[in-house]
Amino acid sequence: NTWHNPANNSVKFISVLIFYLFAVVFRMDEAEKMPIFGRMVGKRALDVAVSVLTCVSVWLKPSFFQVFAPALAVYFVTDFIQTRRSFKRYIREAAVFVPPAFLILYQMKTLFFSGAPSGGVEIAFLDVWSHWSPHILLSILAVTAFPILVSVFCRSGPEMNRIMMRSWVFYAVALLELAFLAETGNRRYNINFGWGMCLAIGIITLSALMQFISYLHLDREDRGYRLTVFAGMMLLSMQFFLGIWYYWRVLTTPVQCF
């Protein structure tokens, strides 16, 4: 379940901080500054902070960066299509993640490509996921129904919409890793490619919640607005109570997923 791995738990707060801090820093100009704890901090200092935090997260457990790294490529491509920025800008942004990239490559070489019988990675579509979850589509719908509604009906400002889009990209990469990748050997069903999904669920739910709260503060009282708010409240409540039921099942049965 999502809480039995202490290393992944220790990465959760850091991964959320990196994700949203990078979303802000990526939009900043080189000379721009932002207030943090009463001090004005420049983009370069924030880039260093993102790099250091990402290294710490990889050192604790690579589950965040193994999803965030490929998601970054998607962010850069979509941003280039929309803005036509110079390639130098993307190279500078990517350079922030060179240290954690070297660290995670070293970890993966040690874990998966050391020649040990318990190491190795292969493509095995839904093999590991279906081993733990007999109802994969229902599991996906249970955690994405609220974010889907928010993304479709609760449009907010451009910055929140961008964050929501990036959250979906992060979730999609995590889902694909869990769906397609499997370890070889005796760790095959340890679902180690699923820890990124645990982080992605938290990030996309938090992004959807922030956008929904922003939508609640709109100066509207029309019927469509009230129906959207009601549906959002119902889906958010459903996700909350499904979570309670899930942990009750974890505590009372050997089932890890549903």
Regions found by a protein language model. Name each.
Residues 1-29, 135-137, 191-201:
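Membrane-interface micro-motifs in multi-pass membrane enzymes
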Residues 24-44, 48, 77-89, 152-159, ...:
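Membrane-interface junctions at the ends of membrane-embedded or membrane-associated helices
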Residues 68-98:
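Perimembrane helix-loop-helix junctions
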Residues 97-105, 109-258:
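Transmembrane helical bundles and short interhelical boundary loops of multi-pass, membrane-embedded
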Residues 55, 76-77, 179:
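Alpha-helical transmembrane segments of multipass membrane proteins
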Residues 38, 46-62, 68, 73:
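Membrane-interface alpha helices of multi-pass inner-membrane proteins
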Residues 49-52, 90-93, 160-167:
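Interfacial segments of alpha-helical transmembrane regions
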